[in-house]
Amino acid sequence: EFEYGQGLLGAELPDSTDIFIPGETVADPPCLPQDWDSLYEATKKSVQNPIGMEPLSKLAHKGSKVTIVIPDIVKGGLQETAHRRVSIRVILDELYKAGVEKRDILLIFSNGLHPRTNVEEMQKILGDALFNEFYPSGQITSHDSEDYDHLVDLGTTDRGDPVLMNKYVYDLSLIHI
C-alpha cells in the first residue's frame, strides 16, 4: 500500500520490484528546517532566481492576468508548511510587488482527468487564509476536462490525438505552474 490522495492505495507488484520508501529504505537527504519562515525564505530565493527564465518581478506587471496552477488533492500535502501553501504565498507576494492586482489573479486546480476539486478539498489544500483570500471573490476554480465551454482546441498530435487546453490558462498572460 502507498499514500494516494487522502488514503492508501494497494497494488500487487512483482517480487523483482524495487520499492523506495523515503526515510526507510534509503536515508532522507538533508533538508531545510520545516518551519514556515525557513521554507518561505528558501522558496522566495528560488522564485527570485529561477533557472533559465526571468524572475516574476520582470515578467509580471500592473495589468498582467495571472493564473497559478495547483496540483489536486491526489498529490497530498495538506500540512501548514506544504509546498503548495508556501510557494503560492511567495508567488503572490512577488506578483503584488511587481504591481499585479489581486483581482487579476486566478488559482486553478489542475486535476487533469481526475474528478473536479470540490470546495472542501480546495480549503484543505490551500488552508483557511489563502482560501478565504480568493474563494469569496470567485478566484479559485477547478479544471473540468468535460466542460468544453472552458477548453480550447489546439488541434491534434501527429498521431491524431486531440490536444485541449483549459481556457482560463490559455487566455492569461502569465502562467506559473
Q: In which residue ranges do the predicted regions lie?
A:
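Structured loop/turn residues at beta-strand edges in well-structured enzyme cores
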Residues: 103, 170-171
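Conserved small/polar residues in nucleotide/adenosyl-binding loops
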Residues: 175-177
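Metallocofactor- and cofactor-centric catalytic cores in central/energy metabolism, strongly enriched
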Residues: 1-163
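Short, well-ordered alpha-helix to beta-strand connector turns
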Residues: 63, 172-173
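Residue-level signal for threonine
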Residues: 166
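A short, aliphatic-rich alpha-helical micro-motif
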Residues: 60, 169-170
